[in-house]
Design a protein with these regions (language model features):
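A short, exposed helix-loop element centered on a Lys and neighboring polar residues
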Residues: 161-162, 208
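Conserved mid-core segment of classical short-chain dehydrogenase/reductases
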Residues: 30, 34-36, 103, 124-147
Length: 284
């Protein structure tokens, strides 16, 4: 059998779901997270937030990185910087809110790159941040925004995990790593300017269930709780963080933590890792 077309060297395969979830051209996520269009002034590994940092980190370690995104053009610049630095990378369009899209995308990944060794779920959403103070209570939260939050934080992780678990179980190895935030630790009220975060508790619960089901099969499942704001020009522009830039968390350091989890010896696996700036509060 010949080598996959996108991965002719048969490198280990890392799939990053939501590699550009906050970097949609001219979208509200881009303006919040980055403060402007993605510029050339930042180092490549910091130019596209956590998704970009993860892609560069695993590519640097000799993996073929598959970037999944709803629109291919969202990831083309990121893929180009990985290629120019000697890394191996491909792009596959995927919408976590549509079952058919997930199934089709992973069929392409298996054919063109190979069975994934690492799956990182980094899809994000900002549903509800635009709502005003008089819409703060749950009774005012629009149903369509609720569906968006649930599709991204609950249904999407379930669908993508199903696509990689059979091969990982049969092989007896693999890593599934979920990027989550501090609001996944317990249900909280939604304040003005925040997303509806409680669906993220279900992503955490899924990771815990998968840990119990698949650890014995050699599959390492872990949640990374990012307890704070990820550093970017957009977050640095927030008034509270202009006064306290020490509260920002470096995306490159977060990516290092993901790679550390993947490389752990199976006699000593971490299943949940909480990352907090040294001067920031530790959520509970």
């Amino acid at each position: 059998m010949g080598s996959p077309a996108d991965n002719p060297r048969a490198l280990p395969v890392t799939v990053i779901v939501g590699a550009t979830s906050k970097w949609q051209p001219d979208g509200p996520n881009t303006r919040f997270a980055h403060g402007r269009d993605v510029g050339q002034d930042l180092p490549p590994e910091r130019r596209w937030g956590l998704g970009g940092a993860l892609a560069h980190r695993f590519a640097r370690e000799g993996h073929h990185v598959v970037l999944t995104t709803r629109r291919r053009d969202n990831a083309e610049a990121l893929a180009a910087t990985i290629g120019s630095s000697g890394g191996s990378c491909s792009i596959v369009e995927l919408d976590v809110g549509t079952t058919g899209s997930v199934v089709d995308a992973f069929s392409v990944i298996r054919t063109q790159a190979g069975d994934p060794d690492v799956l990182i779920y980094n899809a994000g959403y900002m549903a509800g941040r635009e709502l005003t103070a008089d819409q703060e209570l749950l009774e005012h939260f629009p149903n369509d925004l609720f569906e968006e939050a649930v599709a991204t934080a609950c249904r999407g992780p379930f669908l993508v995990a199903k696509e990689v678990l059979p091969a990982m179980r049969q092989r007896g190895s693999g890593s599934i790593l979920f990027s989550n935030n501090q609001y996944s630790l317990r249900g909280r009220k939604r304040s003005t300017g925040q997303s509806l975060y409680y669906p993220r508790t279900m992503m955490r619960a899924l990771a815990q269930a998968l840990t119990e089901e698949y650890s014995a099969h050699g599959v390492h499942v872990a949640t990374v709780v990012v307890d704070g704001f990820i550093d970017s020009p957009g977050t640095r522009a927030l008034p509270a963080l202009q006064e306290r830039p020490d509260l920002l968390i470096d995306p490159v350091s977060i990516a290092d933590a993901f790679h550390y989890l993947h490389r752990q010896d199976r006699s000593c696996w971490t299943h949940e890792l909480q990352l907090t700036a040294s001067t920031g509060p530790v959520s509970s």
